[in-house]
């Protein structure tokens, strides 16, 4: 019977991949629901003047960056997502036992990246359905669960970096 301590050490923090799988699952189920419940650009007001459900397709990156490209951007962003995902898995595996905050952050970013990667490769676009706005004057670009996970994970990574600098901790390589 293998030693449980050795097993945990060799896996590093890969046990946090369950969070990645959960993010991908919630992301894909929510996208499937809204794609089947709404027509393109239809809005359902949830909180008047602030929050709506909608259906939008994004062929670009964040904020529709390069969305008007001829299709090459699909594969560029897919390649970037694959490389970033591989780096995140290696980073996650190398984390120490006490790096729970960082492990959660990496798992969130990885889940978001994989959720949007699936859309980009299989559908040719990313499905967005969350629309935050202020009256009819200001609209934040539509986004999805994967985008939210990436954002929360990135904020957690930034906070971890500032905490490490402030306390003089060494940053894990």
UniProtKB/Swiss-Prot annotation:
The pathway noted for it is: Protein modification; lipoprotein biosynthesis (signal peptide cleavage)
Q: Which domain of life is it from?
A: Bacteria
Q: Which biological process terms from the Gene Ontology are attached to this UniProt entry?
A: proteolysis
Q: Which residue spans traverse the membrane?
A: 14-34, 44-64, 72-92, 98-118, 139-159
Q: What is its EC number?
A: 3.4.23.36
User: What the protein does?
Assistant: This protein specifically catalyzes the removal of signal peptides from prolipoproteins.
What name is this protein filed under?
A: Lipoprotein signal peptidase
Q: Which organism is it from?
A: Pseudomonas syringae pv. tomato (strain ATCC BAA-871 / DC3000)
Lineage in the entry? Bacteria, Pseudomonadati, Pseudomonadota, Gammaproteobacteria, Pseudomonadales
Name the gene that codes for it: lspA
